[in-house]
Amino acid sequence: MSFRKVVRQSKFRHVFGQPVKNDQCYEDIRVSRVTWDSTFCAVNPKFLAVIVEASGGGAFMVLPLNKTGRIDKAYPTVCGHTGPVLDIDWCPHNDEVIASGSEDCTVMVWQIPENGLTSPLTEPVVVLEGHTKRVGIITWHPTARNVLLSAGCDNVVLIWNVGTAEELYRLDSLHPDLIYNVSWNHNGSLFCSACKDKSVRIIDPRRGTLVAEREKAHEGARPMRAIFLADGKVFTTGFSRMSERQLALWDPENLEEPMALQELDSSNGALLPFYDPDTSVVYVCGKGDSSIRYFEITDEPPYIHFLNTFTSKEPQRGMGSMPKRGLEVSKCEIARFYKLHERKCEPIVMTVPRKSDLFQDDLYPDTAGPEAALEAEDWVSGQDANPILISLREAYVPSKQRDLKVSRRNVLSDSRPASYSRSGASTATAVTDVPSGNLAGAGEAGKLEEVMQELRALRMLVKEQGERISRLEEQLGRMENGDT
């Protein structure tokens, strides 16, 4: 008889979240109070954008990532809308282009100066007018340049070519009620939507047809969300009939029953899912919650595997997620969230603890880069393409103190294996046998030679220690896999 392992093996089992220090937060930001279940925040490797309170119209703030600390009340904003801004989204193919949707029924696309704003930005690059009610959803196509989707409270989905300000597709008969959210699939050939009528729909935008539909995906009356995963499955969040918050996983080929359905708690805030296709981890943030739960999605039942919960004291008003190419890979950072408080934005770093200071190939497979795979015209003609991937290895920066850390650990460690003691002793000799008087009285050449001797000895220790770490990691890997 075979017994299932009590603890499921996962490289993400020990992922932990940690807020940054106070001086790395963005203070004194008046986050929008508008009633709308949006993230209110968008971030890319260059800029942080936050929807803020504004008198006489709608505005959002765009800050260079390094502009932390207290933000001056007179700091310039993007303020061209005549009504409150409801949603913002950075273009995945240009880190200086952002789109916004507003209660004034318009979509605007903005070009942010390379070094950030020095004066209020009131003139968008283009204004897209086609909705008759407020525009609450904005999302760029993942692979086609200049293709933007907007959805409004008029229950209409519009797809635009931003480069020509042209309306490409109008889908006005597929949603009988308010649209809660829209999510493109991996190559942008389909999108899924969650609607107030409790249905999840999968739609082919170019044909204007309904590919699949699941009624009452979640039976509760509160808002739900649906997102596409990289393998084509659909992940949803919502509420049960008893108002308990739920997660579910669906196969679009068969929407009769969910592949998995989990109940979380009975809080009333909408659950906002953030998905990382490289690691198959979904982070779930509830509006008004003070926690972030994260789950790994696999092909093995029960398919949705709880990993851990990051908990803080303050409730979140909104949340932004950094694209993978903006993370610090040298610190084994696999996600970074920008949590909105009432008057500040706090980055939260998700890290996989690793002892090795080398680039972690298993954590960082090639990821979607900033280059568009298609032009808008190609996509309209029926072409599809997956995102163009880039390696994050070039972004890896070894720790500047790596040699110092390793040498200290080896010189001071009493549990060092015998095979390393000779090298350690020779290093200690190289370091301690040089009389201080000689250093003081010797010429520059003598000083240089002594320093070089010490450096060579330390390098040898580093090399040997690195080999030992590699062997131990291999042994640990075999033990975890049950090979030994």
Swiss-Prot record:
Residues 444-482 form a coiled coil. It is found in: Cytoplasm, Cytoskeleton; Cytoplasm, Cytoskeleton, Stress fiber. GO terms for molecular function: actin filament binding; Arp2/3 complex binding; identical protein binding. Residues 404-446 are annotated as: Disordered. Pfam families: DUF1899 (PF08953), WD40 (PF00400), WD40_4 (PF16300). Keywords: Actin-binding, Coiled coil, Cytoplasm, Cytoskeleton, Phosphoprotein, Repeat, WD repeat. WD repeats lie at residues 80-120, 130-170, 174-213, 217-260, 265-305. The keyword Ribonucleoprotein does not apply. GO terms for biological process: actin filament branching; actin filament bundle assembly; cellular response to platelet-derived growth factor stimulus; endothelial cell chemotaxis; negative regulation of Arp2/3 complex-mediated actin nucleation; negative regulation of smooth muscle cell chemotaxis; positive regulation of lamellipodium morphogenesis; protein localization to cell leading edge. Phosphorylation on Ser-2 regulates the interaction with the Arp2/3 complex and cell motility in fibroblasts. Phosphorylation does not seem to affect subcellular location. Residues 410-430 have a biased composition (Polar residues). The modification Phosphoserine is found at S2. Ubiquitous. Belongs to the WD repeat coronin family. Forms homooligomers, but does not form complexes with the other coronins. Interacts with Arp2/3 complex components, including ACTR2, ARPC1B and ARPC2. Binds actin. Regulates leading edge dynamics and cell motility in fibroblasts. May be involved in cytokinesis and signal transduction. This is Coronin-1B. It comes from Mus musculus (Mouse).
